[in-house]
Amino acid sequence: MKGGKIVQLTRPNRINSEIRAIKVRLTGVEGDQIGIVNLREALKKSEELGLDLVEISPNAEPPVCRIMDYGKFLYEKSKSSKEQKKKQKVIHIKEIKFRPGTDEGDYQVKLRNLIRFLEDGDKAKITLRFRGREMAHQKIGVDVLNRVKNDLIELATVEYFPSKIEGRQMIMILAPKKK
């Protein structure tokens, strides 16, 4: 065979004959402390039970080893990590753009969308854009942001409220209230 590679599996824990310590601190199947024993004795005990000797903490002095079924241990570990991933909620920031002259109908539609975003558990970013002469009437922009804030007071908390205009826009960030 030409140019073949030998792929060595790297396990997170050393098992059975891979353990290099002379003496180990041994724990039983149920987690009960057996004590500090010779590696040969520990391997013998694990073979008698038909299980594996797994090095749990290699940096300890002496290394901690446990008698267990290694395949079952890996399965349980992957299962618990999958469960943790399921429980994590990714929070997205949804953006809605307003203008100082946004009419009532458009305002209600945008407010409905904001309510939907917040109920889904996402943060909402309200961007208020100014064009041309609207820059002279920044008070109207602040009034629009205050109106949005007051309309959503039961659903959201204000994470960031602009103190002044940034460029040609003002940005307010809302986070959903915890239930």
Curated annotation (Swiss-Prot):
Membrane spanning stretches: none
Keywords: Cytoplasm, Initiation factor, Protein biosynthesis
GO molecular function: ribosome binding; translation initiation factor activity
Subcellular location, record wording: Cytoplasm
Biological process, per Gene Ontology: ribosome disassembly
Record carries keyword Cytoplasm: yes
Disulfide-linked positions: none
Top-level taxonomic group: Bacteria
Site (Important for 30S binding) residue list: Y107, K110
Pfam families per record: IF3_C, IF3_N
Classification via Gene3D superfamilies: Translation initiation factor 3 (IF-3), C-terminal domain, Translation initiation factor 3 (IF-3), N-terminal domain
Recorded GO CC terms: cytosol; membrane
Primary subcellular site in the record, as a coarse category: cytoplasm
Subunit structure: Monomer.
The protein's role, per its UniProt record: IF-3 binds to the 30S ribosomal subunit and shifts the equilibrium between 70S ribosomes and their 50S and 30S subunits in favor of the free subunits, thus enhancing the availability of 30S subunits on which protein synthesis initiation begins.
Membership in a protein family: Belongs to the IF-3 family.
Protein name: Translation initiation factor IF-3
